[in-house]
Amino acid sequence: MQRSKVPEDFLSLAGACGQERTFPMQKFYRLSVNIVKILTLLLAVFLFIGSFLTTCYAENMETQQVLLRFDNPLWNLLELAGYGLLFACCLSLSGKAGTKFRRGLLVFTLGLILLLGGMLIVFGRTVPAADALSVYNAAAEWIFGNKDIIHPTASYLSYYPQQLGLMAFLELLLRLWNLTGLSAPAWHFIKLVYVCLLCVAVLFQYRSLRYLWPNDWEPVSCCYLILVCCNLPMILYSSFVYGEIPSFAMLSVGLFLLLKLLADCIPAHSVETTSPDDTRVVGTSHALSAVTVFTALGSILFLTLSVMLRKNSLILIIAVLLVLFFEALRPGRSGRARIGLMAMAVCLTITSVGVLPLVQKCYEKKAGNTLSSGVTAMSYFAMGMQESSRGCGWYNGFNIDTYDAAGMNSDAANAISRAAVNERIAYFREHPGYAVNFYLHKHLSQWADGTYASRQATLATYGGRSDFLKEVYEGSLASAYIEWGNAWQNVLYLGMLLFCIATVRKRRPGNGSANAAANDDFRFRNICLYTYTGLIAVLGGFLFHTIWEANSRYIFVYSLLLMPYCAAGIHDGLVRLAAWRSNRTLTRHSNS
């Protein structure tokens, strides 16, 4: 019995119909990737120029006024050259020793974090202060049975109900500490937990490199670990009993699972076809397995926890939602995969938006009382347009004063804030030069501070701080710490810039010459949109903090998100430099 043959004309017609549907979607996807490439390149140029030419810092720890100085470009170039030599030596050792060196460097990095973080706990003696102390005390009072912290007016949480997520986390840690029966302050235990969470964050960000750049992740990971080892503000923030470190740890795990989901569980590759205009189309029919479902649920869980611990993480959630939407439309994904990614986006939206109200309802039900809606977002926008003793757009008390003046009525507070916004807009229109200077200083005070206000955030102590750390905070070593942070930040932004440049370069096919590897930038030019998740979040954070209350502490998490891209850019830059030198040597020999 002979099998019936399908006419070739029918197959050609079916393929053409499929391509008609696929190619517009492919172009739409590539257009979105190209837009992200251009915007992130512009941001990288802006950030690097600002950081390379200027430095913002605070000398007086009482007033904490942000000062601005112009840097010596030659000195900055010397510092960059020193870092470049360090990275080159690291890559050389990695090339010789291979996997053993990379694994040893990972163990060394995690050990260094534990060592320095532990030493900071013992000798730094940092204690919670300001908002951190208020949240800590609220958690402690709740454990002692004081339900008055849940009150519509007479409570810190009635002004800032978004802190309930962090309070719930601190309550858990305090209850665990109370089980030990030790009399030492619990915040030392919390700082130890934060050091461990910082190791978790670094480990999962390190593991994410395999999915970001599968071809070059090993040398890139070495550059990444060197960046981590040199990041002193990150160590100082491990003693900051607030939401930055635990939230970033949750973000790192959630993003790792997201990248694993998109790269491994439901990849969009397998069969390739080519259109008349040389557009590459890929197709696959992967089913959604149990591993895929649990990976997606895990990513949703940890990303949601990051929002619970720090509400500003919603900026990264928005970036993730955008990536999920465009990845669902990406050609090559099966119908099940598209539906699954869209369903994941819907679930993540619901959980990230609803987690804090849910926590609030739980506490209100236990206390038998309610909280007010809290200080309004509009008042923060208004405050971000005003002068402050610390800097342009920094905290000046307008938000809480407005909320009090309005009798803790959100509508009245919003009306006052809108009037203040309109007043400042009118003033900016009348004085455009002042407006440019205001927002330039606001930008630099946040993004050109290589310490990320780490000394200010961890300054408070009840005594016992070592003489060495006293000098770092307020003495002769403060300027050295500021310079160290400035140099590290210059490297961070330069690496980001090199990565963004590599992604927008036109592809030139390798010709077998010494610089063929440098010319063939397929590694970066054809990367997927999900690779840019961190950069999209940084772009969103840049726009948000331009209009929100200013503080360089808010930029700290974005600097951590940039480290993988910086490492990739540094590796690519060194590869191109080595190829250029090799090609130049060959040219000299051929001419002679």
Language-model segment annotations:
Residues P7-M119, G340-V346:
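Start-transfer (signal-anchor) and selected internal transmembrane alpha helices
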Residues F48, V66-A81, P185-C196, H441-V538:
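Membrane-interface anchor segments at the N-terminal boundary of transmembrane helices
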Residues L133-S158, G165, S389-G397:
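Extracytosolic helix-loop segments that constitute the early lumenal/periplasmic catalytic or substrate-binding loops
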Residues N137-A138, S155-A184, H188:
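Short hydrophobic/aromatic helix or loop-helix immediately within or flanking a transmembrane segment
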Residues L192-P214, V253, L498:
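Transmembrane-helix motifs of polytopic, lipid-linked glycan transferases
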Residues Q205-C230, Y532:
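Transmembrane-helix signature of polytopic, membrane-embedded enzymes
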Residues E364-G463:
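Membrane-proximal stem/loop segments at transmembrane-domain junctions that anchor or position
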